[in-house]
Amino acid sequence: MKTSGGSDAAKRRAGESAAETVTDGEVVGLGTGSTAAHAIRRLGDRVDSGLDIRGVATSFASRELAAECGIPLLDLDEAVGSDATGIDIAIDGADQVAVGEGESEVGPLIKGGGAAHAREKLVDASADRFLVVADPSKETPVLNRSVPVEVLPAGRSAVAEAVRAAGGEPTLRRAERKDGPVVTDNGNLVLDCAFGEIADPDALSTTLSTTPGVVEHGIFVGLADEVHVGTETGVRVARR
């Protein structure tokens, strides 16, 4: 489920900071969520001023916003196919970011509050550089929020049992504006799985990834190259 917290001004500073690193001719992965939306809008402004880029959307929502902002779009297959140059940079938000000593270390993330984490991970992992944008409310010493797990509809019960066996408590994500569950852009369901403090995100990531019926989960380990954290006065950048 989506997280709240952090001012819109802080989110805007983070998103715009990452957008300013994009250079002419690049293919850009366009993330999902309120902070990533600020990056998309800033990129749209830069396109209006002559920046030559192409975007790869991570969700229906980011595709719609990019189109509104005048950013030319590619499908993922067009961007990473055998005749393509690849994705140069991806900019995406996070629901929680583990920070290291002195808030300068890039740690693992939890994503998927918008139920787009399967495509987000595909795009973000394909990029040469992956920049995370967030506000301070998303920072934590240890990941502890529920992990979104996208599952095949037929595998919901089996995956739920596997999550319980791994020490988690799964909850089917319900839609807010219609009866029934959330259905992802891929036609699947989402289990929000509470594990408490996640001492070993890498191990849990492996466990979930190897569970039959799991399409993708929201733990991102070792993917982020930079984290841009917007504050009330500026932007703090951590680099790997």
Curated annotation (Swiss-Prot):
Enzyme class: isomerase
Known EC number: 5.3.1.6
GO molecular-function term, one example from the UniProt record: ribose-5-phosphate isomerase activity
Gene Ontology biological process terms, A to Z: D-ribose metabolic process; pentose-phosphate shunt, non-oxidative branch
Active site per UniProt: 120
Pfam hit, one: Rib_5-P_isom_A
Pathway the protein contributes to: Carbohydrate degradation; pentose phosphate pathway; D-ribose 5-phosphate from D-ribulose 5-phosphate (non-oxidative stage): step 1/1
UniProt-annotated binding residues for substrate: 32-35, 92-95, 111-114, 138
Catalytic activity: aldehydo-D-ribose 5-phosphate = D-ribulose 5-phosphate
Region (Disordered): 1-23
GO cellular component, one term: cytosol
InterPro entries given in the database record: NagB/RpiA_transferase-like, Ribose5P_isomerase_typA_subgr, Ribose5P_isomerase_type_A
Keywords: Isomerase
Family of the protein in this entry: Belongs to the ribose 5-phosphate isomerase family.
Known partners and oligomeric status: Homodimer.
Purpose of the protein: Catalyzes the reversible conversion of ribose-5-phosphate to ribulose 5-phosphate.
Stated name of the protein: Ribose-5-phosphate isomerase A
Naturally occurring in which organism (per UniProt): Halorubrum lacusprofundi (strain ATCC 49239 / DSM 5036 / JCM 8891 / ACAM 34)
Taxonomic path: Archaea, Methanobacteriati, Methanobacteriota, Stenosarchaea group, Halobacteria
Gene that encodes it: rpiA
